[in-house]
């Protein structure tokens, strides 16, 4: 099962910290940095040390269950994305399973039985705070797990529903390892720079009172005026949106003269 894994520097650093961590570990890494690879490398290392260890991945959607199973297979880890609570334990011919947070909410007792001593990965853990019942179910289902690795693409807070297995400072989740967009950009070949140009323009619309009004985005308006201005700007029948798209297209063509793969 074990095979060489080429890790980016941040993944190797995170894996080193994870190896000496306690039961729970939260890794926050910018989208596209390779959270899945890091998590599977951590699981592979842990399972190599204890071949009896089973792996359970919790993903946000059914589509991502299949993606996780495919990614794990490239590491020599075979996960069942079709597991159901009616199943009698974990499949004996697999290393583990992939479920969704919704499945956890309705199958916590069954998962608690199979998660004892297991390695659990929570993908986009902030989803567990979407509903109070999801967080409670996650706690019940994976309290018996031996190791719990939580992943997120961005720092998050929980104003109302605290997420289990996550350490907080005030309302802010405290990651054990963080790799931000700036870090990834500085490393090169991890993420690409993103450019957000500001675009102004003058919008003209007729209010409910029949009065014709005009304003740019720089003008201060009340809530009603701001809403009307935005609707006017985004109207498919107006001129502003077309002008913005034309300008963006021209800017992209110009950028591609020096960076051929810009914008795609």
Feature locations, PLM:
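Hydrophobic positions in the central parallel beta-sheet of the AAA+
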Residues: 27, 97-99, 120
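Conserved pre-motif I regulatory segment
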Residues: 1-28
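Interdomain helical connector at the RecA1-RecA2 junction of SF1/SF2 helicase-like NTPases
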Residues: 2, 160-263
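Conserved nucleotide-binding/hydrolysis micro-motifs of P-loop NTPases
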Residues: 62-64, 102-105, 126-127, 154-158, ...
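Inter-Walker segment of RecA-like/P-loop motor cores
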Residues: 72-110
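SF2 helicase catalytic motif II
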Residues: 101, 111-157
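Pre-Walker A (Motif I) flank of P-loop NTPase domains
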Residues: 21-27, 53, 95, 262-264
């Amino acid at each position: 099962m074990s095979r060489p894994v080429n890790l980016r520097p941040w993944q190797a650093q995170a894996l080193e910290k994870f190896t000496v961590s306690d039961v729970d570990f939260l890794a926050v890494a910018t989208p596209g940095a390779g959270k899945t690879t890091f998590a599977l490398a951590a699981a592979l290392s842990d399972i190599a040390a204890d071949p009896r260890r089973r792996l359970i991945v919790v993903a946000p959607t059914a589509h991502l269950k299949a993606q996780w199973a495919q990614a794990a297979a490239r590491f020599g880890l075979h996960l069942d994305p079709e597991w159901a609570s009616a199943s009698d334990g974990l499949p004996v011919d697999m290393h583990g399973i992939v479920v969704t947070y919704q499945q956890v909410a309705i199958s916590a007792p069954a998962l608690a039985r199979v998660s004892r001593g297991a390695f659990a990965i929570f993908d986009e853990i902030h989803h567990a705070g979407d509903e109070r019942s999801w967080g409670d179910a996650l706690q019940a289902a994976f309290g018996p797990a031996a190791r719990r690795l939580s992943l997120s693409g961005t720092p998050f807070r929980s104003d109302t529903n605290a997420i289990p297995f996550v350490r907080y400072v005030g309302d802010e989740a405290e990651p054990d390892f963080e790799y931000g967009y700036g870090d990834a950009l500085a490393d090169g070949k991890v993420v690409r720079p993103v450019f957000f140009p500001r675009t102004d323009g003058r919008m003209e619309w007729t209010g409910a009172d029949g009065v014709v009004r005009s304003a740019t985005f720089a003008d201060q308006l009340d809530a009603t005026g701001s809403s009307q201005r935005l609707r006017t700007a985004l109207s498919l029948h107006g001129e502003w949106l077309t002008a913005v798209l034309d300008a963006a297209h021209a800017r992209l063509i110009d950028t591609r003269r020096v960076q051929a793969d810009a914008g795609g």
